[in-house]
């Protein structure tokens, strides 16, 4: 963003863990975004209390309260960190008013965005969906494999600390699996995808860990080397906006044992005969801006959402900059 371009003003709906972490990231770390409002429904929530202390306009009356704020017209982008059902109602109110929505729920009303894979594909969309924490962590790996060879089936298992799962996450478990599975196919490129989430009750809490399994039909070692290189490049890319994202161990590519009924996992009508399984083990440590370091699942969502908002900031702010140049 140039020096003459104004900062893009954002609002956050949802004053829980994700919403509060978004606010902290915008205030402390973004050079192109600025907070315009924090919206909640619990006047005693920690998120609203922190926002007030930081001088951010607040309302505990939900989206209706946001509409009544004196600076509502100045807000360009709205992050929705509520729930899938709540987002449907919020979008119905806000989209007609010309606000850009970044949806951090599994509602998936708009196109999926995973910054490391398709950051520039939906820059003009009125409402984009950030998939899920498991999707943000694992879909880049599926895409990295797909760029080298077709993926007949991809399965991801996201294990997160139970303490990091708030009411919104717990209420959306079914939507999590459905949305992530769909995005594994549409963004990751797998012909069939499956997602599993595990809430790990261990105490002290463990950081987010993800397993990605891909079935491929590629027996040659050269392709295997290319897959490993593609995955490492992708991990490095994601780590530019989620520094705690890393491989837990080396990528494993193993032959599918004879007689293994892997074809039962494939999409209906898929004639592929998988020869190898690619196994990738990841961990995601949070940046601890607001959330504990073990909550990498929440940190990767907020980091991805901010990354997308910053990527479209020039487009949103450009008209004002152009007007200023003509004065």
Swiss-Prot record:
Disulfide bond annotation, renumbered to this chain: none
Gene3D superfamilies cross-referenced by the UniProt entry: Dihydrodipicolinate Reductase, domain 2, NAD(P)-binding Rossmann-like Domain
Positions of NAD(+) binding: 15-18, 164-172, 297
EC number per UniProt: 1.2.1.10
InterPro entries recorded: Acetaldehyde_dehydrogenase, Acetylaldehyde_DH_C, NAD(P)-bd_dom_sf, Semialdehyde_DH_NAD-bd
Keyword NAD: yes
SMART domains recorded: Semialdhyde_dh
GO molecular function, one term: NAD binding
Catalysed reaction equations from the record: acetaldehyde + NAD(+) + CoA = acetyl-CoA + NADH + H(+)
One Gene Ontology term from the biological process aspect of the record: catabolic process
Active site annotation, chain numbering: 133
Keywords assigned: Aromatic hydrocarbons catabolism, NAD, Oxidoreductase, Plasmid
Recorded superkingdom: Bacteria
Pfam families: AcetDehyd-dimer (PF09290), Semialdhyde_dh (PF01118)
NAD found in the keyword field: yes
Family: Belongs to the acetaldehyde dehydrogenase family.
HAMAP family (alphabetical): Ac_ald_DH_ac (MF_01657)
Protein name: Acetaldehyde dehydrogenase 5
Originating organism: Rhodococcus jostii (strain RHA1)
Taxonomic lineage: Bacteria, Bacillati, Actinomycetota, Actinomycetes, Mycobacteriales
């Amino acid at each position: 963003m140039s020096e003459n371009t104004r900062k893009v003003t954002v609002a956050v709906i949802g004053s829980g863990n994700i919403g509060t972490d978004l606010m902290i990231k915008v205030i402390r770390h973004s050079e192109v975004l600025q907070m315009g409002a924090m919206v909640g429904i619990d006047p005693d929530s920690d998120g609203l209390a922190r926002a007030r202390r930081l001088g951010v306009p607040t309302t505990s009356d939900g989206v209706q309260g946001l509409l009544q704020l004196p600076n509502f017209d100045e807000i360009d982008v709205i992050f929705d960190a509520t729930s899938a059902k709540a987002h449907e109602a919020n979008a119905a109110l806000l989209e007609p008013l010309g606000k850009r929505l970044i949806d951090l729920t599994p509602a998936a009303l708009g196109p999926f965005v995973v910054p490391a894979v398709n950051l520039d594909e939906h820059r003009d969309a009125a409402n984009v969906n950030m998939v899920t924490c498991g999707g943000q962590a694992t879909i880049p790996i599926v895409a990295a494999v797909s760029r080298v060879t077709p993926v007949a089936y991809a399965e991801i298992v996201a294990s997160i600390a139970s303490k990091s799962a708030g009411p919104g996450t717990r209420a959306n478990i079914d939507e999590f699996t459905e949305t992530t599975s769909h995005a594994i196919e549409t963004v990751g490129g797998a012909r069939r995808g499956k997602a599993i989430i595990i809430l790990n009750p261990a105490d002290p809490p463990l950081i987010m860990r993800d397993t990605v399994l891909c079935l491929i039909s590629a027996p040659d070692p050269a392709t295997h080397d290319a897959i490993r290189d593609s995955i490492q490049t992708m991990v490095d890319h994601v780590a530019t906006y989620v520094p705690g994202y890393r491989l837990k161990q080396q990528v494993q590519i193993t032959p599918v044992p004879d007689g293994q009924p892997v074809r039962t996992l494939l999409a209906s009508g898929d004639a592929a005969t998988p020869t190898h399984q690619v196994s990738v083990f990841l961990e995601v440590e949070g940046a601890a801006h607001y959330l504990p370091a073990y909550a990498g699942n929440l940190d990767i969502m907020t980091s991805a959402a901010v990354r997308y908002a910053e990527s479209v900031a020039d487009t949103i702010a450009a008209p004002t900059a152009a007007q200023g140049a003509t004065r």
